[in-house]
From Swiss-Prot:
Belongs to the SLC12A transporter family. K/Cl co-transporter subfamily. The gene is SLC12A7. One of its GO terms (cellular component) is synapse. This is Solute carrier family 12 member 7. It comes from Homo sapiens. Homodimer; adopts a domain-swap conformation at the scissor helices connecting the transmembrane domain and C-terminal domain. Heterodimer with K-Cl cotransporter SLC12A5. Residues 1-119, 173-196, 441-450, 532-554, 599-612, 652-1083 are cytoplasmic. Glycans are attached at residues 312, 360. PANTHER family: SOLUTE CARRIER FAMILY 12 MEMBER 7, SOLUTE CARRIER FAMILY 12, CATION COTRANSPORTERS. The chain crosses the membrane at residues 120-142, 150-172, 197-225, 250-270, 272-300, 420-440, 451-473, 505-531, 555-571, 574-598, 613-632, 636-651. The keyword Disulfide bond applies. Residues 664-680 are annotated as: Scissor helix. Residues 12-26 have a biased composition (Basic and acidic residues). It holds the Pfam family AA_permease. Chloride 1 binds at residues 433-434, 589.
Amino acid sequence: MPTNFTVVPVEAHADGGGDETAERTEAPGTPEGPEPERPSPGDGNPRENSPFLNNVEVEQESFFEGKNMALFEEEMDSNPMVSSLLNKLANYTNLSQGVVEHEEDEESRRREAKAPRMGTFIGVYLPCLQNILGVILFLRLTWIVGVAGVLESFLIVAMCCTCTMLTAISMSAIATNGVVPAGGSYYMISRSLGPEFGGAVGLCFYLGTTFAGAMYILGTIEIFLTYISPGAAIFQAEAAGGEAAAMLHNMRVYGTCTLVLMALVVFVGVKYVNKLALVFLACVVLSILAIYAGVIKSAFDPPDIPVCLLGNRTLSRRSFDACVKAYGIHNNSATSALWGLFCNGSQPSAACDEYFIQNNVTEIQGIPGAASGVFLENLWSTYAHAGAFVEKKGVPSVPVAEESRASALPYVLTDIAASFTLLVGIYFPSVTGIMAGSNRSGDLKDAQKSIPTGTILAIVTTSFIYLSCIVLFGACIEGVVLRDKFGEALQGNLVIGMLAWPSPWVIVIGSFFSTCGAGLQSLTGAPRLLQAIARDGIVPFLQVFGHGKANGEPTWALLLTVLICETGILIASLDSVAPILSMFFLMCYLFVNLACAVQTLLRTPNWRPRFKFYHWTLSFLGMSLCLALMFICSWYYALSAMLIAGCIYKYIEYRGAEKEWGDGIRGLSLNAARYALLRVEHGPPHTKNWRPQVLVMLNLDAEQAVKHPRLLSFTSQLKAGKGLTIVGSVLEGTYLDKHMEAQRAEENIRSLMSTEKTKGFCQLVVSSSLRDGMSHLIQSAGLGGLKHNTVLMAWPASWKQEDNPFSWKNFVDTVRDTTAAHQALLVAKNVDSFPQNQERFGGGHIDVWWIVHDGGMLMLLPFLLRQHKVWRKCRMRIFTVAQVDDNSIQMKKDLQMFLYHLRISAEVEVVEMVENDISAFTYERTLMMEQRSQMLKQMQLSKNEQEREAQLIHDRNTASHTAAAARTQAPPTPDKVQMTWTREKLIAEKYRSRDTSLSGFKDLFSMKPDQSNVRRMHTAVKLNGVVLNKSQDAQLVLLNMPGPPKNRQGDENYMEFLEVLTEGLNRVLLVRGGGREVITIYS
């Protein structure tokens, strides 16, 4: 249940002594006596656990820094100087967030530190190329072109490549939204989607990678048994009940042996797999080059590859050589080997198959070449049912009534019933592998640059290869050869190999090693993915798979991966495993697009991808395309995959560990009702989800109208319609007397909110004092998770005026309240000069003066403002101050690197502030400030004296009148003394009580300024001079707001310091962080 507690003062004193009373009542057991002065919770700047820096180190080092920043010295323990922060943050090396990494020994850690970082080409482009180009290209693409025709094949490839391109765009946006952890794709997805969706998608990704291993192993065995060594088959067609059944049994036996062998290689050492990766990649590249070389050669010198036809039916040439029925030798005829296959004997009089007798045997060129014109014949699809003849269009054929022995004759038959949807499912795995680059994010020099560039270039390259191969295969190869899946009409040779130049063995050997390498890569990556999911602890029953060998190798995860991979191998058919693989990868890609779309639509402040070429409509299109492809491939597989993902989601939701990763899905909870409120109330949001939920404190005039309406304009510009906005105000008095005024004030505020397009809630409090009302608002505004974390208010411009001498007291106490509540504070000075929503700045700068680090609000606010049309054309500049001991050149480089990782575009300038003597102006200004402070106190004492004196005279006059009335009724008693007040006595009594105060006023002109105040004033004057020099013409200046002094006797001096700090600037926003990080470099 949502709970709200409001702290109210025990006893309110007009002179501000209620704070001390409240402190005394909090500790009734404290022994009496003088207490040492302790800062109250609002005086400092309490820090929460920071995702940026180690607070212990900061506290140890802060003693030595900031010697020239006296205005901020009381907060150095919590707010470090910028130079110290940049030194820790800018030169990080791949931090892993959210996962307990295995403790590696010092030697391996030293080796990793020395390992060279990879660039875009080696680190992303080539691995993606190797993973995308694979077994389907070599073993199935020609068959897909033959069955679906060039047009439909082109459509299939275009759909799949478009799907992966859109997914790559979404993935690039996610990958460049902060530092990509070394965990790769799983961490990127899970940290964007949250533990429930992240775990479900992570397991789908794991199962897809595991089944990919099974598919590659089956491809390896198919190449080996069909094209390299057919004689190595253990099961023969006669014993196994048919050639297809024998092939399946052989695949299972050889596949299992290969899986065990590969698993042993992975178990012994992954380094061998990584070393062989370039060799396997070279095989792929050489094979593709051989294909293009063969196409070029076929245009002017086609290879002599005859294909034998009986009628219009294609014959398998595994059992005969000559494509003739009989030979003519010396005027005598002799039957051929083909005759013996179709007849009961080799004699010319033997009984033969009816179709064999009725039709002629012809021979055509299997690869007529690019100039042959065969392209038009291959344009259209030729789908057929299982067991159908592979027939050539346009060749005459005499049909026969009944053919019972067709399967036993040497025809080329279709092994499965083909359809458009089946071909999509079989082909899609050939475009997966786009996340190979992000999986290596820990080894990249600049992951934010390399991942989008390398991945998209790899997809463009492979899409070009696939689409061009479809056109070239259709233009060079005869249709019946394309539809011959296993090359039976080519004497058992690989179709694509016969096209290649200089030799078919280039393709056969190249494809064999490339599929071997891809299988090894899958068996290497899948266990690590499972280990990462297990170590996250979101799926309790998988935690055992998070353990491994002493060097961190995932032994148990490898064992489970091998078992799951074995189930794919037992299926034994590449065409059956591929659609299963497609489902898991499509599910994964769907959620990547969903994550990007959700983050874009939510406009979370942390969503600042460095990759700019994305849009939520592209992500939505990619998500829709993934969903469509899932159901196109197989509707029952699609439903099964979604059911599996849904079950995992619900399991993690109800049984999994509580995780908070700053994901985009959880941001949707702020737009929901009770259920979402209860979910977001569990704790503060993750740094990545932090956005300013603003409580705007408005001042009202005597007619309950808003004094500073442009404060609401600024609020709407800052919020841009997103997040929570509470507009609050306080009326002095009692609610019974002021409820009509309160309603009128609330109507005025709502009307102004509507005019300024500020979407939010209005909350008005009637309180006996302005101070208490503001405190109540800060404590209790909002509900559950919909609570503010930032307070926005206007600077009290009249704090020096005599008609409002104590407005500064409410202001300083409000600063302390926000600090104690861990809330950020924004103070707009000269708020009436801030722009309205209708105005547009055509240029100019938003200048940020980053003096101390208090959570990153200074960087976040300009980014949010620049989303609005008013500030969009303004450029952002960040200034920071270097002191004598700082290396300003290195500071600038570090700050540029830091902003690069924050994905914020800004000009950077480091301003050097040398230590110099305190000027006479600073002394004079400090002296004037302290004299005014003392004078205010003396005036307050004089006012109290006057009030007490007037009350005394009133009492005495009342007493004298009562005595006179009594004398008319009774005689005077002798023991009473009658006092007579003359004018002289009254004046003497009056001025005698003021002697002390007059002497106090005389002392003001002989006092010397306090040295700590002089140093603070020195800082304020120097900073103001530097800011004026650089930012006098800026459209907006953002400054760190120093905290109020721990000694509350100097509150009015604090106001003077802020006044001096911002003097001469047009629009100023003073920013004070809420004690927690609000911006992060992580994705």
